[in-house]
Amino acid sequence: KTDRKEEKKNVILGGICCGLALCVASNLQQIGIQYTTVGKAGFITALYIVLVPIFGIFLKKKAGVRIWISVAISVAGLYLLCITDKLVLAKGDILVLLCAVVFTIHILVIDYFSPKADGVRIACTQFFITGVLSAIPMFLFETPRLSDIFAAAVPVLYAGVLSSGVAYTLQIVAQKDADPTVASLILSLESVFSVLGGWVILGQKLSIREIAGCILMFSAII
């Protein structure tokens, strides 16, 4: 009974903490991306690959030399992949940078709670908290209409079910046995797959710079 109570406590507390972090990070990203380029937003958001090992130092989770080398290679790859103009910080960039900080906290919170409770239950609690908290500003600052929701049904369902539901659940389950810095490096491949997806699905052309960025990022993970 004691173990069940402890696990239930960790599910609720972990779900609340993860949900709060995910809500803040997602909203900062979505607001910030309106005031910056997609490339810069992708690069700055993925800076959690640097922030996670830095924050980990204060939590007594020091990363080895090989990990830091991988982080450096990955950042270089991200820069080639995402940045096409000068990196000058604007209003949107600062919001996205704050988003990267909160995503760092999200990864570390998952690292703390995932070994202590069932990952799927934590994920379900996380999504409930994120949904409720995100609904508040939606009704305060937006005018949601069913016609608009139905018009965007496909991207909304994809983002809700696959990009959020499946992906974040797998993240929590997988981080039970994964180092947070390694997890952040793997998660940063999102930028690579988005570019490759545009090439395969949308027929977009890849520049030599982007190909080099993809190679560097895959090399960093390996």
Predicted region positions:
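Transmembrane alpha-helical segments that form core, pore/gating elements
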Residues: V52-P53, V88-E142
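Glycine-/small-residue-enriched transmembrane alpha-helix faces in small-molecule transporters
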Residues: K1, C17-L20, V24, L28-Q34, ...
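C-terminal transmembrane-helix exit sites in multi-pass transporters
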Residues: Y48-I69, V192-I211
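Specific transmembrane alpha-helical segments of multi-pass solute transporters/efflux pumps
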Residues: T2-T45, L78-L80, G160-A178
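Membrane-interface helix-cap regions at the ends of transmembrane helices
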Residues: K1-K8, I54, I73-L89, I129-A152, ...
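C-terminal-most transmembrane helix of multi-pass membrane proteins
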Residues: K1, A152-V154, S188-I222
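Hydrophobic transmembrane alpha-helices of multi-pass small-molecule transport proteins
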Residues: A63-I83, C99, F103, S134, ...
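Helix-helix packing/entry segments at the starts of transmembrane helices
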Residues: A41-L47, I110-G131, S164-V200
